[in-house]
Amino acid sequence: MSTSLLFSLSPSSSSSMRLRASNSFPILNFFLDLDATPSLSSSSASFSELSAPLSIVSRPFCTRDDPLPSDLMNPLLKSPFSLTKFPAANGPLEITCVLFKYLAIRLCWPPAPVTLLFLLLKCFLSLPLLDSSSSFTLDAAASLSSLDFLATAFGLNFNEGLADPPPLEEESFNDGKRPFPLLLLILNECYPA
């Protein structure tokens, strides 16, 4: 039997948004705040750490000469990403949210990282456009199959582990050889040149 959860999306300030579950799933109760400084514990990774509030700062495109700061990383995120790392009791819904948290850390791109993440959420779940007054249900049973779509979109391979994504350089942004085609398609649609 599938489990449906009810979410509500509402702005908590002019530059931050809140996505909060209406039940007791702690991994879902996280914040994405454009004004705060990213922070993750460098100690051993656990679901309690990953479910803590996560902040994201708008930052320049990452290049080979400008890797992601080490303080954004976590031992779990440095190791090969595998669904077998997560106990089955945590369920596909929590695994999906951990993946989103990973993407949030790795893809802190301007403009509007928070907006981009919610657009991704809309995209792979085929949901109506989200706004400050909308609510939607997420089927936990369907969320695991959605990981296949994310894996394809972001070049992830859950069987071989998660390799570092290719660097995104400003000069290659519009050269016809775009990495992360789904992300860039969304960016182009929402933020046309």
UniProtKB/Swiss-Prot annotation:
Disruption outcome: Diploid deletion displays a weak budding pattern phenotype in a systematic assay.
Alphabetically ordered keywords of this record: Signal
Signal peptide residues on this chain, from the entry's feature table: 1-14
Biological process (GO), any one: ascospore formation
Leftover remarks: Almost completely overlaps RPC53. Disruption phenotypes caused by deletion of this gene may also be a result of a defect in its overlapping gene.
Name this polypeptide is given: Putative uncharacterized protein BUD30
Gene source species: Saccharomyces cerevisiae (strain ATCC 204508 / S288c) (Baker's yeast)
